[in-house]
Amino acid sequence: MANSQLDRVKGLIDSLNQHTKSAAKSGAGALKNGLGQVKQAGQKLILYIPKDYQASTGSSLNDLVKAAEALGIEVHRSEKNGTALAKELFGTTEKLLGFSERGIALFAPQFDKLLNKNQKLSKSLGGSSEALGQRLNKTQTALSALQSFLGTAIAGMDLDSLLRRRRNGEDVSGSELAKAGVDLAAQLVDNIASATGTVDAFAEQLGKLAMPYLTLALSGLASKLNNLPDLSLAGPGFDAVSGILSVVSASFILSNKDADAGTKAAAGIEISTKILGNIGKAVSQYIIAQRVAAGLSTTAATGGLIGSVVALAISPLSFLNVADKFERAKQLEQYSERFKKFGYEGDSLLASFYRETGAIEAALTTINSVLSAASAGVGAAATGSLVGAPVAALVSAITGIISGILDASKQAIFERVATKLANKIDEWEKKHGKNYFENGYDARHSAFLEDTFELLSQYNKEYSVERVVAITQQRWDVNIGELAGITRKGADAKSGKAYVDFFEEGKLLEKDPDRFDKKVFDPLEGKIDLSSINKTTLLKFITPVFTAGEEIRERKQTGKYEYMTELFVKGKEKWVVTGVESHNAIYDYTNLIQLAIDKKGEKRQVTIESHLGEKNDRIYLSSGSSIVYAGNGHDVAYYDKTDTGYLTFDGQSAQKAGEYIVTKELKADVKVLKEVVKTQDISVGKTCSEKLEYRDYELSPFELGNGIRAKDELHSVEEIIGSNRKDKFFGSRFTDIFHGAKGDDEIYGNDGHDILYGDDGNDVIHGGDGNDHLVGGNGNDRLIGGKGNNFLNGGDGDDELQVFEGQYNVLLGGAGNDILYGSDGTNLFDGGVGNDKIYGGLGKDIYRYSKEYGRHIIIEKGGDDDTLLLSDLSFKDVGFIRIGDDLLVNKRIGGTLYYHEDYNGNALTIKDWFKEGKEGQNNKIEKIVDKDGAYVLSQYLTELTAPGRGINYFNGLEEKLYYGEGYNALPQLRKDIEQIISSTGALTGEHGQVLVGAGGPLAYSNSPNSIPNAFSNYLTQSA
């Protein structure tokens, strides 16, 4: 019998070879045809019906015969009764199957009995009748599955027979074993295919089911993983146990804690268990049953091993890519709805690609999984000594060949889908006369305006301008790029597109439909022209904008199935901005990219050349080089809105006011916007790949070199705000207005009447020659006045203020513990809050003290006309006491005036009051004035104050005071203070109007308007 069956096996080989050749050409369709040929040429199954057989309740003899005939099973009606026939064929009446001279005998009574005993037999053997089609009933389904099973069993018997013969020393060639192995693999594939109907039906069914299942809440991943048998064996010996999953795949399942990845793995489990059903269980049952049918013994332990390995072969990872495709399609379809209303359906096209290729992937992946499961089961049977070891190797090799054919077919199908999408794009472009991918960027920009309208509409109010010119850049879009790559149209997709939009009164102005107006903004030529605008205007680059120039793209083949779309940028050397002529304007260049690196690593820089109007302008500069012709008006240049590096401002060579050279040092810690070239990799199946180069930007260091230097030329710029780093300023011989902004800055005003601000940080400010204003701001600053009349304000922090020359000087310590050094001219001192030390000079000095100040120490060097103003204290609030050579001024604490070492000098200590200086000079303050204008002369304080004895208003001081009509000291003191302040060159008039550096309505928030005005008001009011 074995030899006759072997002859039949040999006949199958030609059929299978023909199948593999056709499959290589036509993919899944050829596979289906090949499987049909195998089935038609399979082992002959004959249904034997004894003459005394009567069908049981629930079925009929007629149904059984019809089902057999529909499946091509021969029906033999015997003249013998059931018992005689059974004993003749099977030797017993209890067997279902046996052998006859004509083929394999199926005993109808026993089969009928089996059907009625197990109503779910058809499902366990071959799937539901619905899966096979409505025309096949349960009986037909069971017969079909049994027929396929018998083919597998007999193929296994033939292979087993060959192996036994070889072990017994017979000459059995390797080709005979290979042919038998091929037959076994083909039978296994046929079994699984029959369980789901045709290959086409299966693909369609899976495509329908995949999307709904992926929408399920996938939970309980850990418990599902725990149910995979023998998963604990994963590790170094994992491959040796199963031979199916790699260590990488196993470690992915076991160790990846990322939730997203877990969801994907769970999705794979859902597909494998819910859509595929119990394929692993079915395959292992087929293999075990096949061995039993072949007369070989098995054990529960070996059966468990087979089931375990088969379960691992159908891993959730096998379906990970399938799950990704359907999920990606779903996400893209949802995403596309946003842009369809703006006339772009590219995202929906991309979704259709993932849907169609996902269905193909699902069908072919499932067939591959079945092949892997079959190979795994046979391998496990070999491990359990149920079959010889060569069987596993043969089956594995054959299934590998079939898998390769499927992969080749898949690639061709994927490319056909891509071509279909490309044709749709061509049709759209022909109809609309526009680049499809540019239309995608237009839709993205429309959505951007919709999303950011509230923000953009606020700029009119925020910047106090009538018109906003907003420039944005739609950068490279990965979906647009992917669609271009898949459709082989990478050369047609630009790196993005730039747009200009106008806002007035918070409303978007209508203009050209494509929102691109070359009259105002031309990114190809690098020109921006606002000269036609007759309103106060803000020019703002909302997003980073690429360097000016034209993109050239070329698609080339770089390998057998590899393509590259190369990018070349024909860049411009500079942007030219023509400003608003007759209205105030603001120009914000901080998002205009000036530094670029091409794909070869070569660096280039794009200069911004600005020709501004005749009014007051503000210009925010970036990290690259700029040339600014600011024109008339009070114009301010800002460097603190973005990282512009370490700056040096130099006006020492200026021939006109407002001329400066700004050098920028971009060290390793300086991150700037720079243009770079990146690559998007796109795969169309496994073998075909597209690489698309595109421009993008990033915020990172940019090392200058190769002749590239960042330098600004400023012309007619009246005020400069530095960076947030350590800057150096060198003024001109004209008026300079500098702001250090953040960082520890060094500022040198040099000649001219300068206004210098340190702002935040520990700054050093030198006024140089001229009447200068120096303001330290926050931090521990050092202010040096130099020649001329100087106005120094330390601001917050522990500051040091010095003036060495000049007829008039104002020194304000501000908050903190300060040290003030006056000149030998006329000095006005106000130490401010904190414990300060003040050094007077030989000239006429005025010291101001307020009750909220701390302990001030005054070292008066001489002079005979010094004044101390107690700005908000009366003589009733203070007392005087001599300690050594010092005169101490005490102020009341909680309404009580104390004379005690803990309280003495809680207001002021005037050092060496009672110590005579050289050549008759004294260290006294000749006049002390209170808030009401009453004053006392130093000679009376000297007479009344004995060592250790306090003197105040109530014990002798009152009679020495000068006050009341005719004796009020405040009017004259007010005049003296105003003269000192106005002599510094900053203030004049009754209310202290600023003449230098006013800045107009666009003045910097820390401009000279604020501090001198406020100081003049409170100082003169108190006087």
Curated annotation (Swiss-Prot):
Origin: domain of life: Bacteria
Matches recorded under Pfam families: HemolysinCabind, RTX, RTX_C
Domains (record comment): The Gly-rich region is probably involved in binding calcium, which is required for target cell-binding or cytolytic activity.
Family: Belongs to the RTX prokaryotic toxin (TC 1.C.11) family.
Main location: secreted
Topology class, membrane: Multi-pass membrane protein
Ranges occupied by Hemolysin-type calcium-binding repeats: 730-747, 748-765, 766-783, 784-801, 812-829, 830-847
GO cellular component: extracellular region; host cell plasma membrane; membrane
Other comment: ApxIA is partially deleted in serotypes 2, 4, 6, 7, 8, 12, and totally deleted in serotype 3. The sequence shown is that of serotype 10.
Source organism phylogeny: Bacteria, Pseudomonadati, Pseudomonadota, Gammaproteobacteria, Pasteurellales
BP GO terms, sorted: killing of cells of another organism
Matches recorded under SUPFAM superfamilies: beta-Roll (SSF51120)
Subcellular location: Secreted; Host cell membrane
TM helices/strands, residue ranges: 226-256, 297-326, 367-406
PTM per Swiss-Prot/TrEMBL: Palmitoylated by ApxIC. The toxin only becomes active when modified.
Organism: Actinobacillus pleuropneumoniae
Gene name of this polypeptide: apxIA
Gene3D superfamilies: Serralysin-like metalloprotease, C-terminal (2.150.10.10)
A molecular-function term among this protein's GO annotations: channel activity
Primary role: One of the virulence factors of A.pleuropneumoniae, which has a strong hemolytic activity and is cytotoxic for alveolar macrophages and neutrophils.
The name this protein goes by in its record: RTX-I toxin determinant A from serotypes 5/10
Protein keywords: Calcium, Cytolysis, Hemolysis, Host cell membrane, Host membrane, Lipoprotein, Membrane, Palmitate, Repeat, Secreted, Toxin, Transmembrane, Transmembrane helix, Virulence
InterPro entries to which the protein is assigned, alphabetical: Hemolysin-typ_Ca-bd_CS, Hemolysn_Ca-bd, RTX_C, RTX_pore_form, RTX_toxin/Mannuronan_C5-epim, RTX_toxin_determinant-A, Serralysin-like_metalloprot_C
